[in-house]
């Protein structure tokens, strides 16, 4: 019984240390708000309007990528959200921006066979996407630490729903397609809310 109390106390102390550490990191790491990111995300197309405000024509203004208007989370198929979380970061809804279990597994793989798996969570990937097109990417240790700090700060200031919504709108998916709306229309011919289980898995 004494061992149980000792383990419980140790766990409580560890959780307190983690909570304080992440709070300090978040306080020292500035990030934009969700609305700032959403409003500053520009699509690759521009709409030509008539004098009365009616749309006349859509023009492609960026030929390097195809990114359409921002899509709210409620307008994205839950099947797709589940598929992305399962494939990219299955503990997304529970971690604080960094997944210690995946990180430890990646380190073990690296030392075991030299082919380490990526340990970046969805929040860490979003941190890279927000900071000038994934400039953190697969870079130096210092840049990875910066990505780690940024992800923790995002988790403190944004909701999980905001994080997954921003990720799905900013992530490059296939070829020139950026964001879920461009990918859904380009690959399947319909909006993100109509994706079924099979399409979501793709």
Region locations from a protein language model:
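Juxtamembrane regions of bacterial inner-membrane/periplasmic proteins
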Residues: 1-202
